[in-house]
Amino acid sequence: MTKRWFITGTDTDVGKTVASCALLQAATAQGYRTAGYKPVASGSQMTADGLRNSDALALQANSSQRLGYSQVNPFTFLEATSPHIASESEGRAIPLTALSQGLRQLEPSADWILIEGAGGWFTPLSPQATFADWVQQEQLPVIMVVGVKLGCINHALLTAQAIQHAGLTLAGWVANEVTPAGRRQAEYQATLTRMITAPLLGIIPYLSDIEENPVTTRRDLGHYLDLTVLRAAEREAVNM
């Protein structure tokens, strides 16, 4: 049976894609046939191959399965703004059924699929629906990425509470150090570990060379994470 995980963040720019690539690398190293799925992406560039989003390209590059770009990212928008605004501006609706259809198309070729959201948990996809609605519809276990910085504790606890109130499994969380280590960073992480009931999968350190060595090409991220706790969360979900 295909394992499916949804990656959300406590905010925009907290490192969801870095964490997603690390998870894909770790799962691939354990022998899984992996596929990254970024169903909706805004903030893209026009290339010779068409509109391309850097986050989606990173997921494509870190998937063990050979996937076409449109399989990884069926909804690509040019402007870097909330998907529901980009959707209205470009006149392209984002039906939840289409997101599910794209996911189903990946399942035959992969046994470990990582789905990366856009922005935070309640990011709107239309005036009526949010990403959270789709995740709840699909009953996906969730991995939360926390960008460790001032304010992250409140954002993380609110996001974790919303996920659990939706009746979904918060399978784990990743601490991503988005800035160089500050005076209180270790205390932020200790507080998060104590107050978030889900297990910590690992800490990704601040990557000072991310511009010169982007996640599209680097293969040194998977060792920061421990997937054994995900297997435990999966067993717990089955037994519920």
UniProtKB/Swiss-Prot annotation:
Active site: 38
This protein's UniProt keywords: ATP-binding, Biotin biosynthesis, Cytoplasm, Ligase, Magnesium, Metal-binding, Nucleotide-binding
Main location: cytoplasm
Location relative to the cell: Cytoplasm
Reactions the enzyme catalyzes: (7R,8S)-7,8-diammoniononanoate + CO2 + ATP = (4R,5S)-dethiobiotin + ADP + phosphate + 3 H(+)
Transmembrane segments: none
Reported cofactor(s): Mg(2+)
UniProt: ATP binding residues: 13-18, 55, 116-119, 176-177, 205-207, 212
GO CC, alphabetical: cytosol
Pathway(s) served: Cofactor biosynthesis; biotin biosynthesis; biotin from 7,8-diaminononanoate: step 1/2
Pfam families named in the record: AAA_26
Signal peptide span: none
Coiled coil: none
Gene3D superfamilies recorded: P-loop containing nucleotide triphosphate hydrolases
GO molecular function terms listed in the Swiss-Prot or TrEMBL record: ATP binding; dethiobiotin synthase activity; magnesium ion binding
Single GO BP term: biotin biosynthetic process
HAMAP family in the record: BioD
NCBIfam families: bioD (TIGR00347)
Quaternary organization: Homodimer.
PANTHER family in alphabetical order: DETHIOBIOTIN SYNTHETASE
UniProt record similarity statement: Belongs to the dethiobiotin synthetase family.
Function: Catalyzes a mechanistically unusual reaction, the ATP-dependent insertion of CO2 between the N7 and N8 nitrogen atoms of 7,8-diaminopelargonic acid (DAPA, also called 7,8-diammoniononanoate) to form a ureido ring.
Protein name: ATP-dependent dethiobiotin synthetase BioD 1
Gene name linked to the record: bioD1
